[in-house]
A protein has these predicted regions:
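Helix-turn-helix/homeodomain-like alpha-helical modules used for DNA recognition
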Residues: 80-123
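Helix-boundary capping/turn motifs
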Residues: 20-25, 42-46, 64-69
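DNA major-groove recognition helix of helix-turn-helix
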Residues: 48, 52-55
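Charged, helical or coil segments that form electrostatic protein-protein
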Residues: 68-86
């Protein structure tokens, strides 16, 4: 499997957000990520799931790479800059994801904790 370039992540975020907002369907977002960004069709689904999870807390997803984790978290917090409740919920969902994977003994998620600590100080 090829490494997904960091340059593709802003568009992954954009399509995931558009699907969440109902501007396009989840399947359209997945196809755009797959076709336009040349990301594996199966993996393309994870970006929407991660975005949705950070906002709603529904269905925790796979852990994406650190750049993606940080980018999505930062952009969601920017989008909700005037909504402290949503920012707190998003950070809580992120923390629960860390705890979920550590609890499943997937291994230490120190890098995720560093990302969490960076943003929790801002809320």
């Amino acid at each position: 499997m090829n490494k997904i370039p960091n340059e593709a992540i802003p568009d992954c975020f954009k399509y995931s957000k558009h699907a969440f907002e109902g501007k396009i369907t989840k399947e359209e977002a997945r196809l755009k990520i797959h076709e336009e960004l040349d990301i594996n069709f199966g993996s393309a689904r994870d970006y929407y799931l991660y975005y949705n999870y950070l906002i709603t807390g529904n269905k925790p997803t796979w852990v994406l790479n650190n750049y993606t984790l940080g980018y999505f978290l930062e952009k969601i917090l920017e989008d909700y800059k005037n909504d402290n409740e949503q920012k707190k919920k998003t950070l809580l969902h992120f923390k629960k994801l860390i705890e979920k994977f550590e609890g499943e003994k997937v291994g230490s998620k120190k890098s995720m904790r560093v990302i969490y600590e960076k943003y929790i100080k801002l809320v």
